[in-house]
Amino acid sequence: VALINNQFLPYPYYAKPGAVRSPAQILQWQVLPNTVPARSCQPQPTTMARHPHPHLSFMAIPPKKNQDKTDIPSINTIATAESTITPTTEAIVDTVATQEASSEVIESAPEAKADQVTSTVV
């Protein structure tokens, strides 16, 4: 087995003299594909031809083009404002006019009540 190792060839090729081998042994030899270097050879420089899959940077999906060209304002969700507790007093008026499912006729006026509610707003 003679190894042809030329600096201009990207991969090593094996040359087998046919006159030395018998016809049965010649049929056993197969042509090596160019993408698989022999394991006994020194490592060759990495090229894209040796990689069955391209590098991940080549498989990046480009961003979709926005057809509307509408600008979305950025909202800062991490606010650094100081939180102060401000008590507020609100008047809540409940107007209750209930009519139950009965045969009674309700003749009274709807009740109105005002409650004072103190809430804490952050």
Swiss-Prot record:
Gene behind this protein: CSN3
Classification lineage: Eukaryota, Metazoa, Chordata, Craniata, Vertebrata
Name of the protein in its database record: Kappa-casein
Species of origin: Rusa unicolor (Sambar)
Pfam families per UniProt: Casein_kappa
Known tissue expression: Mammary gland specific. Secreted in milk.
One biological process term in Gene Ontology: lactation
Residue(s) at site: Cleavage: F58, M59
Signal peptide (residue range): none
Keyword hit for Disulfide bond: no
Glycosylated residues, chain numbering: T84, T86, T89, T95, S102, T118
